[in-house]
Amino acid sequence: MRISPPEREAKKVKIVIDKDPVSTSFDKWAVPGHFSRTLAKGPKTTTWIWNLHADVHDFDSYTSDLEDVSRKIFSAHFGHLAVVFIWLSGAYFHGARFSNYEAWLSNPTTIKPSAQVVWPIVGQEILNGDVGGGFQGIQITSGLFQMWRASGITTELQLYVTAIGALVMAALMLFAGWFHYHKAAPKLEWFQNAESMMNHHLAGLFGLGSLSWAGHQIHVSLPVNKLLDSGVSPQEIPLPHEFILNKDLIAQLYPSFGQGLTPFFTLNWNEYSDFLTFKGGLNPVTGGLWLSDRAHHHLAIAVLFIVAGHMYRTNWGIGHSMKEMLETHKGPFTGEGHKGLYEIFTNSWHAQLSLNLALFGSLSIIVAHHMYSMPPYPYLATDYATSLCLFTHHVWIGGFLIVGAGAHAAIFMVRDYDPAQNYNNLLDRVLRHRDAIISHLNWVCIFLGFHSFGLYIHNDTMRALGRPQDMFSDAAIQLQPVFAQWVQGVNSAAAGNTAPNALRNASYAFGGDIVSVGEKVAMMPISLGTADFLVHHIHAFTIHVTVLILLKGVLFARNSRLIPDKANLGFRFPCDGPGRGGTCQVSAWDHVFLGLFWMYNSLSVVLFHFSWKMQSDVWGNVTADGAVSHITGNNFAQSSITINGWLRDFLWAQASQVIQSYGSALSAYGLMFLGAHFIWAFSLMFLFSGRGYWQELIESIVWAHNKLKFAPSIQPRALSITQGRAVGVAHYLLGGIATTWSFFHARIISVG
């Protein structure tokens, strides 16, 4: 007798590994380019070293066996994790060995965090600035001190032990990477078992991960932070294991601990509301989110994800099947709906990676916005340098991941997409009306570009002609962001309605009180006006152009009217052969190349907007009578409404600290500012140049070498067009990002 129909049969979990599939051979790996027959022959021309770097991680080019590619990626993930653990270990070791963490912990409002002391070689010790408490070192802006305090670390010994633990984990990861490729490698069906993967990732990674973190926060972080907030010296606070072993210690701080698990099993959960809270707002002592709110949050997340990890059908015939869900997902106008998508995601890792990069990139930018509006860690909000750097960091990371999503979506289209498997499903229908999508996007970009920039040009012209009454500004013709103001109002009015007994709204950015710590503003209501409306439309413009470029690259990756057989030319190609004029720089790779520049444009405006807005309207000092004096004195609303204002009152005015940093502890940023400009300018040499020029130059240099009987055995070649563009964009972004980094650092460390 069958309980479920045959197609609902459970996926039985089997042993799905191969034993000893690949021998461990150092002799093979020692040969440069061992992964490619052509490269393994060694260099004939200088192009060899470029191809070596371009192809070393392109596992698709080694083999078309999906199982082998999957194993290589899986093994590489362990290698990546090992690098992450080594990097973390270094950060913790610096905290343990070279930092003023314990001094900062006892006085976080006046002492600045430092975890690097420069050795006195050729006068570099000038970089060791006075960070307070008699400590000389480089001020750090990673936010690690704040995170360590939040997790309950009170001594540098604890950091030291954690650093050693991270190295042990790194060794374990390296071993796992070798073991799961050479000794016990999973079969393809293991990688393709989407339901089991979802269950384990949701319940295990997110669910149990959050649960264990909630446990740590409740048993270690909460009591330690409560004592620190009360002014108890870090040396007098019991060690973490004492709180866990001695219930009376923690019951003095949180009385419900005295009752043990009785309220849990009698469903009287309200008893635990002394350490699982819904306060909302920020802790007035530290300017960070309430730790008891965060413990509550992680516990709730754990419950949700552990439940979610039981959603998908594996051994027992209950739960969702990914394939069924996707194929049932049809609308009235969407043809076959998502039929064929399951096969795409289980056979193309590029497609899966693309989706994950798009989601994680967006998430990183969302994180950036929450780090200042709802600062999660104690004393983070008043460390303006760290706030600015964390915002900048998460925004750049998000931008790169989103461009990566476009890149891998295009690689999927070129290498993995099978039109026969995708007839009349949503993906096919999007591809068939791609001209409408791209031309509409193009129109939107033109509209936004002319109108957003036009508003600024109007304002510059009116200000130049001495007609302030005719400008778009809060003092003349107002363009108030009414929808954004409505969202702010709804959120500030919602306190108490969004969560049971919540005392404050989620963020003071929406409205409410000024939270100050140590006479500095941690967070306060952010008022929006005409200036924000204008720059917001520049954001809309630059983001839409980035999307246009990336999406055009994906939708036209396989073919176009110009090159119907593009898929045969591959992901990157310079031109469609001789005699086909106008077919250069149209590969999917070239779209990623252009997308990177617009991503950089887009995010530069975002970072400049954030930096200036916060200095003008949020960050500053609070006097005894509650008056706030902001760093740049509210000049954003009137100065940022002209292009000239951005150049004069933001870029030029705020660059004074980095330009005048020579001879001070910030002088490294002055050198970086200069050097990064040079790297950026160097990129232009590759971007504004033709390959022929370089090849011709090389020929004459080779001629001179031959004359002197000094000719190299490896023939010099100019970079290919694609290589030149790659070198150009890499230096453009490195130069641009390092310029921004040094500009922000010198400015905000001086004034923040």
Curated annotation (Swiss-Prot):
It is found in: Plastid, Cyanelle thylakoid membrane. InterPro entries: PSI_PsaA (IPR006243), PSI_PsaA/B (IPR001280), PSI_PsaA/B_CS (IPR020586), PSI_PsaA/B_sf (IPR036408). The chain crosses the membrane at residues 73-96, 159-182, 198-222, 294-312, 349-372, 388-414, 436-458, 533-551, 591-612, 666-688, 726-746. It is a multi-pass membrane protein. Chlorophyll a' binds at residue 677. It comes from the Eukaryota. It catalyses: reduced [plastocyanin] + hnu + oxidized [2Fe-2S]-[ferredoxin] = oxidized [plastocyanin] + reduced [2Fe-2S]-[ferredoxin]. Belongs to the PsaA/PsaB family. The PsaA/B heterodimer binds the P700 chlorophyll special pair and subsequent electron acceptors. PSI consists of a core antenna complex that captures photons, and an electron transfer chain that converts photonic excitation into a charge separation. The eukaryotic PSI reaction center is composed of at least 11 subunits. NCBIfam families: psaA (TIGR01335). This is Photosystem I P700 chlorophyll a apoprotein A1. The lineage of its organism: Eukaryota, Glaucocystophyceae, Cyanophoraceae, Cyanophora.
